[in-house]
């Protein structure tokens, strides 16, 4: 029986999950919910089902795999990572995965808060000012490794790809000074399963955010 991934019909927090499901050749189907237009941004498609799915903490995204019902995007990614041995093999690798997972989510939320803020245009220069320093830390952490934990890909590389590429969409030149990060993105997109997925009708790179966002809602 295929897994079910539920989320809005946007990229959002599901991008890394979709990529990981495709990479692991998982059998899954998507339940994509549509939000209404301004000014109401009607969410009834989701709210009508929210408390009927047996989720402990009802939210989007969710993954249902048989008796396992999981919310929180990183919990879903970790679950899939454990299923496919993509959580790091040594203690050092697992530490790197844990650190980066949380660091990436911090940075993801900073960008999301900016893009939903009514003062977006006023606050954008401040974000762009600190962006090179953020990218430099990722570049130094990756070093000469092919993947962020080491020689083998882990689930955190899927989050890293999403966050780095999302920032590249926001500011096209943000990785120009960091060739190892650009190489990482090319390496990730060059993976056969990922490349095939990106050419398919299932691939959903945009919109980045919901219709409520000031930037990234198209």
Curated annotation (Swiss-Prot):
GO molecular function: enzyme binding; fatty acid binding; glutathione binding; glutathione peroxidase activity; glutathione transferase activity; protein homodimerization activity; signaling receptor binding
Originating gene: Gstm7
Record flagged with keyword Membrane: no
CDD domains: GST_C_Mu (cd03209), GST_N_Mu (cd03075)
PROSITE patterns xrefs: GST_CTER (PS50405), GST_NTER (PS50404)
Signal peptide region: none
Protein name: Glutathione S-transferase Mu 7
Chain ranges of the GST C-terminal domain: 90-208
PANTHER family for the chain: GLUTATHIONE S-TRANSFERASE, GLUTATHIONE S-TRANSFERASE MU 7
Catalytic activity: RX + glutathione = an S-substituted glutathione + a halide anion + H(+)
Compartments, as annotated in UniProt: Cytoplasm
GO biological-process terms attached to the record: cellular detoxification of nitrogen compound; cellular response to caffeine; glutathione metabolic process; hepoxilin biosynthetic process; linoleic acid metabolic process; nitrobenzene metabolic process; regulation of cardiac muscle contraction by regulation of the release of sequestered calcium ion; regulation of skeletal muscle contraction by regulation of release of sequestered calcium ion
Other noteworthy facts: Yb subclass selectively binds steroid hormones.
Cellular component GO terms, alphabetical: cytosol; sarcoplasmic reticulum
Every GST N-terminal domain range: 2-88
Quaternary structure annotation from Swiss-Prot or TrEMBL: Homodimer.
Keyword line: Cytoplasm, Transferase
